[in-house]
């Protein structure tokens, strides 16, 4: 038997969804995929069900570049709640301990936050998708099993206190700009532990993921309303071009002859590559007409070697 053809349209591009609270990232992905009647789609990094905000969804060729988005920096706006410890480190979990936080001040929070700016080693929460012996940690946590987790290096570039509301259960609104793999829930619980009050995430909104911002996003409800009973093609004007997924990489325009060989998986020589980056750096590759061919890596021989290629029709 031959390969079964995927149902749906062979579209390519990216759309930035404003994920609603309460939905899983995969659930949102499947709804968007159905709305566009796409044959291939994937998201670029899960958000907790409690979280809202930027969830880039890639279609077709754009899925080949999703790993680059997974590796990108992120920005979040969150509300940390002090005086309560939960089993999930967010407000979806069960409160395990309550401590009077009425003496907590804004100055205390500012001082605690400052200790987490820069390169830090962070212990991931048990309620996470990280795996131990092939099993997600959150599944172990649901069974009441807690295992030791190794600290992982992450970077918090910016950590800003936006507002502070004192009380027996105090709240702090914060903005965090951080590297991939940073758990905002761990920041909340770790800072709460430092303050000897306990802490968890009450609200979480991702406002940026790589080159994508919340201003570029659209809700599922808006897409559903626009499509109505019409064909999926009416939504295609929302699609961003495939190469925007790697917009942070410098671009290189090849002549038609070099583009031909590059599109067939061959490394090609170009004297301009070292002006774009160093050995191992990535570049976006286009032909002379501006057509996107994929992502290449600069080699020590002055060539660009294909890493991810888009389909050429």
From Swiss-Prot:
Q: Which GO terms describe its molecular function?
A: RNA binding; tRNA pseudouridine(55) synthase activity
Coiled-coil features, chain-numbered ranges: none
Q: Which reaction does it catalyse?
A: uridine(55) in tRNA = pseudouridine(55) in tRNA
Task: Give the InterPro entries listed for this entry.
Answer: PsdUridine_synth_cat_dom_sf (IPR020103), PsdUridine_synth_N (IPR002501), PUA-like_sf (IPR015947), PUA_sf (IPR036974), tRNA_psdUridine_synth_TruB (IPR014780), tRNA_sdUridine_synth_fam1_C (IPR015240), TruB_C (IPR032819)
Provide this UniProt record's keywords sorted from A to Z: Isomerase, tRNA processing
UniProt GO BP: mRNA pseudouridine synthesis; tRNA pseudouridine synthesis
State which Enzyme Commission number(s) the record gives: 5.4.99.25
Active site, renumbered: 48 (nucleophile)
Q: Which Pfam families match?
A: TruB-C_2, TruB_C_2, TruB_N
Keyword tRNA processing found: yes
| HAMAP family from the UniProt entry | TruB_bact
What family is it from?
Belongs to the pseudouridine synthase TruB family. Type 1 subfamily.
Described by its record, this protein's role is as follows: Responsible for synthesis of pseudouridine from uracil-55 in the psi GC loop of transfer RNAs.
Name assigned to this protein: tRNA pseudouridine synthase B
To which species is this protein native? Saccharophagus degradans (strain 2-40 / ATCC 43961 / DSM 17024)
């Amino acid at each position: 038997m031959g390969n079964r053809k995927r149902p749906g349209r062979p579209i390519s591009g990216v759309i930035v969804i404003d994920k609603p609270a309460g939905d899983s990232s995969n659930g949102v992905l499947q709804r968007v995929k159905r709305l566009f009647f796409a044959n291939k789609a994937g998201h670029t990094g899960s958000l907790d069900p409690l979280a809202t905000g930027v969830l880039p969804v890639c279609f077709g060729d754009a899925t080949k570049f999703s790993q680059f988005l997974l590796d990108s920096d992120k920005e979040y706006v969150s509300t940390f709640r002090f005086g309560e410890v939960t089993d999930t480190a967010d407000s979806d979990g069960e409160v395990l301990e309550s401590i009077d936080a009425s003496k907590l001040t804004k100055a205390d929070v500012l001082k605690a936050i400052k200790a987490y700016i820069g390169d830090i080693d962070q212990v991931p929460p048990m309620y996470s998708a990280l795996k131990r012996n092939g099993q997600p940690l959150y599944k172990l946590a649901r069974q009441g099993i807690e295992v030791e987790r190794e600290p992982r290096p992450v970077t918090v570039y910016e950590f800003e206190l936006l507002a502070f509301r004192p009380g027996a259960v105090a709240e702090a609104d914060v903005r965090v700009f951080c590297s991939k793999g940073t758990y905002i829930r761990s920041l909340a619980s770790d800072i709460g532990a430092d303050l000897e009050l306990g802490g968890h995430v009450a609200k979480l909104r991702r406002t940026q993921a790589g080159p994508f911002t919340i201003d570029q996003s659209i809700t599922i409800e808006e897409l559903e309303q626009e499509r109505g009973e019409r064909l999926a093609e009416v939504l295609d004007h929302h699609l961003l071009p495939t190469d925007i997924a790697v917009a942070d990489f410098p671009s290189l325009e090849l002549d038609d002859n070099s583009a031909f060989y590059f599109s067939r998986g061959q490394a090609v020589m170009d004297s301009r590559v070292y002006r774009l980056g160093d050995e191992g750096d990535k570049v976006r590759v286009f032909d002379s007409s501006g057509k996107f061919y994929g992502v290449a890596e600069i080699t020590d021989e002055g060539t660009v070697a294909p890493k991810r290629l888009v389909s050429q029709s």
